[in-house]
Amino acid sequence: MTCLFPRALGSLALLMVVLLVQGELHVKPGGQHREDGTALQLAKRRYKREWVKFAKPCREREDNSRRNPIAKITSDFQKNQKITYRISGVGIDQPPFGIFVVDPNNGDINITAIVDREETPSFLITCRALNALGQDVERPLILTVKILDVNDNPPIFSQTIFKGEIEENSASNSLVMILNATDADEPNHMNSKIAFKIVSQEPAGMSMFLISRNTGEVRTLTSSLDREQISSYHLVVSGADNDGTGLSTQCECSIKIKDVNDNFPVLRESQYSARIEENTLNAELLRFQVTDWDEEYTDNWLAVYFFTSGNEGNWFEIETDPRTNEGILKVVKALDYEQVQSMQFSIAVRNKAEFHQSVISQYRVQSTPVTIQVIDVREGISFRPPSKTFTVQRGVSTNKLVGYILGTYQATDEDTGKAASSVRYVLGRNDGGLLVIDSKTAQIKFVKNIDRDSTFIVNKTISAEVLAIDENTGKTSTGTIYVEVPSFNENCPSVVLEKKDICTSSPSVTLSVRTLDRGKYTGPYTVSLEEQPLKLPVMWTITTLNATSALLQAQQQVSPGVYNVPVIVKDNQDGLCDTPESLTLTVCQCDDRSMCRAPIPSREPNTYGESSWRLGPAAIGLILLGLLMLLLAPLLLLTCDCGSGPIGGAATGGFIPVPDGSEGTIHQWGIEGAQPEDKEITNICVPPVTTNGADFMESSEVCTNTYAGGTMVEGASGMEMITKLGGATGATAALGPCSLGYSGTMRTRHSTGGTLKDYAAPVNMTFLGSYFSQKSLAYAEEEDEREVNDCLLIYDDEGEDAAPHSPTLSSCSIFGDDLDDNFLDSLGPKFKKLAEICLGIDDEAKQAKPGPKDSGSGADTCARSMEVPQSGSNRYQTLPGSLEVTQTGSKICHTLSGNQETSVMSTSGSVHPAVAIPDPLQLGNYLLTETYSTSGSFAQPTTVTFDPHVTQNVTVTERVICPLPSASSSIVAPTELRGSYNMLYTKETCSHL
């Protein structure tokens, strides 16, 4: 046990040694390695020293052959074998050739020629040792042969003459120039070290300069250089090598003294004076001479003249003559003797260049007085002010400038100070011919529009010259006008509507402003309506919403149609477009979805603003046709017979005069008061008549209007049924003497939506009085409890408290409710008589009742009409002649129109009451009212033809107003009525009015 421990310890130590050895063999060194990675140990070889000796130095420009051999080469291999020595390089096999040679057997190198160091400072010789096979046994060596320098080259200056300059009054030790010289000898050697010195100075005298020995810098020695005394210096400088003891060379230096502004200019005179006529200009009134000692024709010598006082009105200018340095006094603004007789001002002078710092503190402004005497002369005309600026008003387009008046620019009489007379104005310079001036009033206006590409516009301004020529003296005065024109907006913003159609219930729409050039013409935009030339009511308004939109809305209720709304848009630079933009807007009736119910017709009656239109071929043709008709009208008038009678009647031989006393009312003519008024009786309505349960007009009222030659029946719907009368052949017997040869009747009916034009005619007031009296009695007898308010009230106003269904005369009064009857108080006897006739108190009129007369040459007018329903239907039978057939007790009214004198008779009263005859089949009790007119109307007599099934119980009442002898008072029953029974004829003839 005791020996195991030592054994184990020894084995462990042996193992560690093996591991250490194995680890050393595999360490990777930084040197060479085998393929297995182990280090390769190289044996170190000891080399011998160089096999050539150093060469001896050679001196230039000497014979160095006595020093041969200058070098020797020897190889250790020559002991064992034959060695051959060879050399090569510059001076051997390169130029210069043959300077060095070698002995091939022993290796001695010899020099054979004189060398120059400046050409070849040193020689490099390549030495080789070769065996018998011509192989190098030694590594080739380089042998250096140095050439020693000798002082054989003098210094050389870079220039023969050096030129320099320096300002006068410069401080001492100021650098003037640096001289440059070189030496070809060995650098950094005494042979090439140069020393400089000044040999001489011209002009001689006090030395003004010095030079640095080593650097060659020439500097000032003093600060007293003065160009005005000596303007340049000439120096001779030498340079010697070997630090001044060797070879030397000389050069020249030319130094110019530069001028500085160290001399003040001084005027030669202490004061100046001159004379000049008023209102004249002078380019050279005076010359000022100045003395300056600085260099001529330089800024230091050139004088600058200026005013120190007295030229506040800028009447004078001083210009310097560059050749003589004199100041030239010019009169650039005319002097007025009436304002100033003498001008005093002061001038001073300085140089164009600033004064030198050495004397600037000594400068003082010296003012010299100048007096100008103004000579009085007879003055002419001039423009005051000499220029005038006009501005085109904002909003005026550049293409609407023709005729635009800018204003006037008149010349002034200098003697009176007022506008000159006997002056003719013309335009001198007028680029583009845009303007024109009135030769008498000097009014200026545009005659051409401005093009945006015009080259005559400079900074938005047009300039022109105005000449005023005195017609007495021939003198001319010139003035300049400037016209500021509106700016052009080449990128006008456009206005876009949110929608084209709007509703009448909400007439508004949003406008949006857009532009293509976003970089220049940006918002905010201002949208406004174009100002209307006429004083029209404002229909639209614009309210700004934001920078690019606005609200267009109607200010009042608008009707459907198409509207053109011109608007003006301003950009952010307040620029306007040349023309306003017109927006087309359609206003329509909308449904619940705010959509137009029906399209708006293409016609635009409600166009707002200006609309473009043109004449078509049809319109042009109509215009030409109208002109042709105007030319033919005089020819047609020559063929007209103005005295012919009415249609269908005999000629009367001329116009029938209106007889006196035929008027039935009192009119206010021009000599009595205001304009005549229409006093005809309004419509008297007839209530519906019922026969066998059938209404005539189906719950509508029937109103009759009597016109010349026809009867009109009005319904509640506003339509008029017109019955016209005409002659027919082959008819039955005539009715009375009014037939005048007619034997039949023809009935024509049609309806129209309007009314015929009424012609005012006088009314027989006597008949109306009796009629209304009888009607009042009839109402009183029919219904006792009914209030009697339908009596003869010519000027009465029944008021608004009448019963709704009670008959009134408010609508049948021949006078208006607001008629003032005070004018009756001033009427004469003639009108008093007429008033008695109208009131029914004229006894003479009642007693004068002439008998009926036969038909004469005059034309009787019989306007009879009768509407009788046929049994079993609601058809009507018309009896020509304005015959009113109504039910007994019903309301009757007859409207009088046209050129007729008409009267109406009712069934009640004391005249001829209607007789009711019962009829078992149809409703009887009819009243036939016949009306005659004999005032000259040309209505034709008619024949009454009854239907075979007409009512048999008829009461016929006849009343004739017969102011003419041709009126007839008899009635002849037609053929159909002669066999009838229960027929009552009543005749009443009125007296002449």
Swiss-Prot record:
Mutant lacking the gene: phenotype: Knockout mice are born at the expected Mendelian rate with no observed differences in prenatal development. Decrease in body weight and overall body fat is first evident at 8-10 days of age, weight difference becomes significant following start of solid food at 15-20 days of age. Oral mucosa show a spectrum of lesions, including inflammatory erosions that prevent the mice effectively feeding.
Membrane topology, from the record? Single-pass type I membrane protein
Molecular function as annotated in GO: calcium ion binding; protein dimerization activity
**Ranges for the Desmoglein repeat repeats:** 905-930, 931-961
Residue ranges of the TM segments: 618-638
The Cadherin domain sits at 50-157, 158-267, 268-388, 384-495
Question: What are the protein's UniProt keywords?
Answer: Calcium, Cell adhesion, Cell junction, Cell membrane, Cleavage on pair of basic residues, Cytoplasm, Glycoprotein, Membrane, Metal-binding, Repeat, Signal, Tight junction, Transmembrane, Transmembrane helix
The tissues in which it is expressed are: Expressed in the basal layer of the outer root sheath of the telogen hair club, specifically at the cell membrane between the apex of the cells and the surrounding hair club (at protein level). Expression is less abundant between the lateral margins of the outer root sheath basal cells (at protein level). Expressed in epidermis. Expressed in the epithelium of the tongue.
Positions on the Extracellular side per record topology: 50-617
Region Disordered: start and end of each range? 845-876
Task: Enumerate the InterPro entries for this protein.
Answer: Cadherin-domain_protein, Cadherin-like_dom, Cadherin-like_sf, Cadherin_CS, Catenin-bd_sf, Desmosomal_cadherin
- For the keyword Transmembrane helix, the answer is yes
Topology Cytoplasmic: residue spans: 639-993
The compartments listed are:
Cell membrane; Cell junction, Desmosome; Cytoplasm; Cell junction, Tight junction
SMART domains with a match to the protein in the record: CA
Where is the stretch described as Required for interaction with CTNND1 and localization at cell-cell junctions? 641-714
* Chain residues in the propeptide: 24-49
Positions of glycan attachment? 110, 180, 459, 546
The positions making up the signal sequence are 1-23
A single Pfam family, by name? Cadherin
Q: Name one GO cellular component term.
A: adherens junction
| Function text | A component of desmosome cell-cell junctions which are required for positive regulation of cellular adhesion. Required for adherens and desmosome junction assembly in response to mechanical force in keratinocytes. Required for desmosome-mediated cell-cell adhesion of cells surrounding the telogen hair club and the basal layer of the outer root sheath epithelium, consequently is essential for the anchoring of telogen hairs in the hair follicle.
Q: How does it assemble?
A: Homodimer. Part of a complex that contains DSG3, PKP1, YAP1 and YWHAG; the complex is required for localization of DSG3 and YAP1 to the cell membrane in keratinocytes. Interacts with PKP2. Interacts with CTNND1; the interaction facilitates DSG3 localization and retention at cell-cell junctions. Interacts with CDH1; the interaction is required for CDH1 localization to developing adherens junctions. Interacts with RAC1; the interaction is required for DSG3 translocation to cell-cell junctions, organization of cortical F-actin bundles and actin anchoring at cell-cell junctions.
PANTHER family to which the protein is assigned, alphabetical = DESMOGLEIN FAMILY MEMBER (PTHR24025), DESMOGLEIN-3 (PTHR24025:SF3)
Entry note about domains: Three calcium ions are usually bound at the interface of each cadherin domain and rigidify the connections, imparting a strong curvature to the full-length ectodomain.
Q: What is the protein name for this chain?
A: Desmoglein-3
Organism of provenance = Mus musculus
Q: Which gene encodes it?
A: Dsg3
